[in-house]
């Protein structure tokens, strides 16, 4: 299911939220409508956590995570960290990262298996990403842009990238990520995919300006038409068990 939402008249909902297969983070403030869209779709399955990061609401750009972990910048206060620890499921690891490029959501695009990161990220940060999120890390650009998290939206089912990504680069990224990939836009022609879209394995939320065509592309590439959370999780666990 792909839905449209707006945060206080802003269509950049990826700036104010973060969505994974085991939790969703939503910025404090905003209209109740924004929360209700998330909670109606996710409330029975994963916790929807209201929070700030470093006293700001741009939590989607400052954090990155997947179903196994969450990374937050060094500006995160002790109270915020404690609130997240209390609110997220127990198996989810939470780690503060002391990284010069502190907008982690802009410099990391990840799913449960792979992370594409800014080429200049510190070695220690790369190791933390690999360890806490339990992913394979690749230093990469998307259509020549170093902000991989801003210009790419990624789930375990597929990926949507900057519209100017060449066919050759799309093939390269697709083989790295091991998921089908398409170049496109969100919010009526915006190329900043990560800021306008959050997605997991069974639902996606896009800015209110997103056209029907853009939404259809999302539903198709992320395989959201008939996706059910419980079915996906149990299928994936069965697959993982059969390979281990």
Swiss-Prot record:
PTM characteristics: Phosphorylation at Ser-174 and Ser-175 promotes nuclear export.
Annotated localization: Cytoplasm; Nucleus, Nucleolus
| CDD domains listed in its UniProt record | IF6
A Pfam match: eIF-6
Instruction: Indicate yes or no for the key word Transferase.
Output: no
Single GO biological process annotation from the record:
assembly of large subunit precursor of preribosome
Segments passing through the bilayer: none
Q: Name one GO molecular function term.
A: translation initiation factor activity
Q: Which residues carry this modification: Phosphoserine?
A: 174-175
**Database matches in Gene3D superfamilies:** L-arginine/glycine Amidinotransferase, Chain A (3.75.10.10)
Q: Does the record carry Nucleus as a key word?
A: yes
Q: How does it assemble?
A: Monomer. Associates with the 60S ribosomal subunit.
| Role according to the record | Binds to the 60S ribosomal subunit and prevents its association with the 40S ribosomal subunit to form the 80S initiation complex in the cytoplasm. Is also involved in ribosome biogenesis. Associates with pre-60S subunits in the nucleus and is involved in its nuclear export.
The text of the family note is: Belongs to the eIF-6 family.
Identification of the protein by name: Eukaryotic translation initiation factor 6
**Gene this chain is encoded by:** tif6
